[in-house]
């Protein structure tokens, strides 16, 4: 089974204006949507499109949390959220008016007792289950939370996927995550230098493998992606052609595609192809990748 963790889910209230935003004035919306999200939830959504079942874990609170939970169930996603006694699941306001303005909610405070509940859930995972940790850590939790969770899973045979940046990523490497997915700029920040060539990116990825990562997947936006797998093989792929209209969730979609591709084929090359198709499908769409768009782009890769 695949499990995703979203520490701070959100309801994104997206407002579209047909003219520039006027601060301090009444602005009339030309359109609006509510999108249920968070990085782990995004991964679960794309996995569903690919026919892979997953369970979305994390924390919800208040009426907004109940609304988010019902909405995800209506989309066909399995969830097993921990319900917090205080606070509310956050609402992010995103105003699209030529440029995009965001007002992101803080989300509820997560007490130690809730973290212990999450650890109890993870303690039931079986060998070869996949656990996907993605995104930042809420302020109410320690920045060592990822390390804490992976340390608790040592010896369980669980395959961990971590999509995070800087210290959050570096500090989990001793726990030998199955997959990490920095982009080329994030990888450069980790190794302390700008990475301009495939050879430089490959060398930096191998350096993270030496610290413990099994597979290193590096996304490079319009330049495609590069994978250094656990056998030392380097796989390079370009991007299909298309107009980028959305950056939200593209990385999450790539993670979902890679995991699904590997589980379905056992091939890292196929995993990279499907991951790239999924990331591109989201980038070329107003929402997350659909199975139809993914299938279309797979023909081009």
Question: Residue ranges of each PLM-predicted region?
Answer:
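Conserved phosphate/ATP/ADP-binding segment of small-molecule kinases
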Residues: 144-231
């Amino acid at each position: 089974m695949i499990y995703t963790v979203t520490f701070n889910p959100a309801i994104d209230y997206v407002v579209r204006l047909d003219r520039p935003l006027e601060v301090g004035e009444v602005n009339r919306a030309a359109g609006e949507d509510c999108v249920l999200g968070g990085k782990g939830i995004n991964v679960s959504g794309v996995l569903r499109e690919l026919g892979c079942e997953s369970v979305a874990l994390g924390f919800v609170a208040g009426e907004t949390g109940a609304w988010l939970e019902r909405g995800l169930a209506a989309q066909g996603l399995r969830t097993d959220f921990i319900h917090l006694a205080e606070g509310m699941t956050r609402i992010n306001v995103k105003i699209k008016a030529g440029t995009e303005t965001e007002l992101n909610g803080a989300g509820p405070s997560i007490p130690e007792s809730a973290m212990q509940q999450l650890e109890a859930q993870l303690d039931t995972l079986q060998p070869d289950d996949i656990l996907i940790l993605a995104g930042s850590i809420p302020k109410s939790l320690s920045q060592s939370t990822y390390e804490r969770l992976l340390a608790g899973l040592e010896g369980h045979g669980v395959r961990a996927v971590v999509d995070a940046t800087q210290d959050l990523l570096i500090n989990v490497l001793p726990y030998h995550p199955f997959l990490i997915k920095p982009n080329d700029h994030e990888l450069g920040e980790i190794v302390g230098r700008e990475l301009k060539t495939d050879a430089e990116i490959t060398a930096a990825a191998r350096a993270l493998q030496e610290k413990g990562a099994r597979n290193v997947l590096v996304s490079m936006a319009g330049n495609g992606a590069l994978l250094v797998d656990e056998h030392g093989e380097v796989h390079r792929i370009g991007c299909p052609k298309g107009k980028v209209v959305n950056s939200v969730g593209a990385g999450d979609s790539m993670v979902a595609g890679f995991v699904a591709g590997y589980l379905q084929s056992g091939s890292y090359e196929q995993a990279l192809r499907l991951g790239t198709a999924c990331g591109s499908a989201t980038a070329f769409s107003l929402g997350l990748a659909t199975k139809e768009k993914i299938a279309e782009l797979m023909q081009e890769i």
